[in-house]
Amino acid sequence: MTEIIDVKAREILDSRGNPTVEVDVVLACGVQGRAAVPSGASTGTREALEMRDQDASRFLGKGVLKAVANVNEVIAPEIIGFDTMDQAGLDRTMIDMDGTENKSRLGANAILGVSMAAARAAAKAAEIPLYRHIGGINARILPVPMMNIINGGAHAPNNLDIQEFMILPFGAPSLCEAVRMGAETFHTLKKILKKEGLSTAVGDEGGFAPNLKSNEEAIEFIIRAIEEAGYRPGKDIGIALDAAASEFYKNGKYVFESEGQVLTSEELVDYYESLVTRYALYSIEDGLAEQDWTGWQMMTKRLGDSLQIVGDDVFVTNPDIFRKGISEGIGNSILIKLNQIGTVTETLDTIQMAKESGYTTVISHRSGETEDTFIADLAVAVNAGQIKTGSLSRSDRVAKYNQLIRIEEALGMGGIFPEDLFV
């Protein structure tokens, strides 16, 4: 009774007001799984293709009717009757139907919508939570949230080069308390920014987006907020960055426009090293550009023993690219984004590779999100230990935190909030 009897896709809006794909999968037993696909702003060049209509007369060319049609007219007829309990088989069928390396024929947004909706339908049919369906009986670790409370780069209309300034409430005794600590710090930061006459408008991921004197000033404001909220920087709450360095990599150099600096790879690593020393940073994501593998190797060798070095654009959740990165000593952690690779199965394969290779995993949202909470369940399902899902504002971000609170409640004494940040 877990066979697919109907598949329906539609065009909806994401958190930026841009179209995205939503898919319903209906099973013979009568249950329905629904999923909405996220979209990124700063994207890796080797991500699976997000199909857009390129029709300037609709949504400024960003419509997704072609992807919707590919679900309804191409994918659906081929998977009617397919058993959703065979997620790997379903995903492989769609990958084979597409026949391209980057899912450019059908669109990763079309394929992923079906993949996620099918997983959710199968969980409903089994009358178990999604995290249990994906992760089995061992799914029990709640993730430490990486909360993006100051936005810059491609995520905000301000002068900060670094894209995300995050807090990690790893000193909390539970996920619920971690969310509380993060919210208190977020609201304290808002009061501080207001007092200083700075903007408290928020960026794509719900963090504040003020114009500041430097990237370092953003860190200093966050430290002040942590302390004024009653917590200890580096003890109760840590700090992490997503540099998104590919966005300011120009002609082989790194250009900090806000500070009038042009840096080599080595000089940029020197800069990060000074930040780690002065501010006790715990994690830096995409510290170098995705094509600067020599710089990545240097940063990993110099800072990898004292810092989580997360690869996002450099790996794009792709098991083949990630495998090469592991062999060449690139980073020690991987960011996991479902829509970078385009199926649930391939995402799980990449996570398994990370675990087997001693890399940490961080489950992540995209800057263009919806109310869908799939990644919250995924983080618990794979015992990732960390999740990146934005700030403590905007319902598209808060929805994931609320789902994690529900999961923690459901797990009860069986749930674990990590004592070691980098599980």
Swiss-Prot record:
Similarity section: Belongs to the enolase family.
Catalysed reactions listed for this entry: (2R)-2-phosphoglycerate = phosphoenolpyruvate + H2O
Class of the enzyme per the UniProt entry, highest EC level: lyase
GO biological process: glycolytic process
Parts forming coiled coils: none
Cofactor: Mg(2+)
Main location: cytoplasm
Binding site for Mg(2+): D242, E285, D312
Protein known as: Enolase
List of residues binding (2R)-2-phosphoglycerate: Q163, K337, R366, S367, K388
Record-listed E.C. numbers: 4.2.1.11
Function: Catalyzes the reversible conversion of 2-phosphoglycerate (2-PG) into phosphoenolpyruvate (PEP). It is essential for the degradation of carbohydrates via glycolysis.
Source organism of this protein record: Desulforapulum autotrophicum (strain ATCC 43914 / DSM 3382 / VKM B-1955 / HRM2)
Functional pathway: Carbohydrate degradation; glycolysis; pyruvate from D-glyceraldehyde 3-phosphate: step 4/5
One Pfam family cited in the UniProt record for this chain: Enolase_C
